[in-house]
Amino acid sequence: MLGTWVLMLMVPSLSVAAERYALIVTGANGEASYAAQYEQWRQTAVTTLVDRLKFDPARVQTLFDGGDAEHTSNAAGVRRAVDAVRARMTADDLLLVLLIGHGSFDGTEAKFNLVGPDLSAAEWAALLKPLRGKVVLVNTTAASFPFLEHVSGPRRIVITATDSIAQRFDTVFPEYFIKALADPSADIDKNGRVSIWEAFLSASMGVRRYYTQRGQLATERSLLDDNGDGQGREAGGEGTDGSAASRTYLAPDVPGAPDTDDELLALLQKRAALQIDADDLKDRRQLMTPDEYAKEFERLMIELAKVSREIRKKQKT
């Protein structure tokens, strides 16, 4: 399929609309149980992009452990796939890179585990740097945090499943991120499309619920960087990241859809952050005195009520 994909990329397009590309890589499987899970996530991602978000199937490339010579998730396959996009990509185009599998950190470098030699965060950054269009890199693996620093830059949105090199356990972030891409409930501003920020927010909240429902401490905290400083921001945290991601969509334009209301979007994001804070407070309840918990709970509920009231006012205008 890669050969056909490369030929297609060499033919000039008659369309002036921005093109959307995707590269989905599931790395070295390891145990058989991982192979089944990674295949499920990969297939779900492809189905979501093609059937729900209307990507051209010829522009969705997959690499995986056990694939044929053109689809094996090794370093050579990754380089071929990125080179194929680079040959065609314009400044108006978008590429989604979704990494699913195992990640590692050896004390010096963070790597995404491939079949054969791995590629480090720095090597991924070098591969993607020549691309002229917008790149959304989502590394859903453990120890993915260093990718934030290396890949971030102008016209780059980087999401990592972890916020520390110490987070080396298997992640559930891909389950919730892939689901959020076309989930109407993730569309918090109700404009008919799920932005990258909204998918990140929905996935982050899903991960928190996963651990809370099991009575476990979360071993992963996702970050998003879209301002190029390599610092990143949690879904419920403070920071300047999120503006570009809030205006970046994988879905095609929706005819007649309202423009993004910056003030409403800020309020919606604030409400989501407060809801995350409320969930965190419940997790910490056993570590607090009853008075401390009651006081903090009351403060959050008052803030939530104020923000919700402002949202209703904006939605009526």
Indicate residue ranges for each PLM-predicted region:
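Bacterial N-terminal signal peptides
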Residues: 1-13
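Boundary/activation segment at the start of structured domains
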Residues: 14-96, 103, 110-112, 243-257, ...
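Active-site-proximal beta-strand/loop segments in catalytic clefts of secreted hydrolases
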Residues: 25-29, 63-67, 98-102, 115-116, ...
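Second-shell loop/turn segments in exported
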Residues: 28-36, 64-72, 85, 109-115, ...
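Caspase-like (clan CD) cysteine peptidase catalytic core
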Residues: 81-100, 105-149
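Active-site-proximal C-terminal subdomain of hydrolase catalytic domains
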Residues: 136-226
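Alpha-helical, heptad-rich or low-complexity scaffold/stalk segments
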Residues: 140, 260, 267-268, 273-315
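Caspase-like cysteine protease fold
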Residues: 187-275
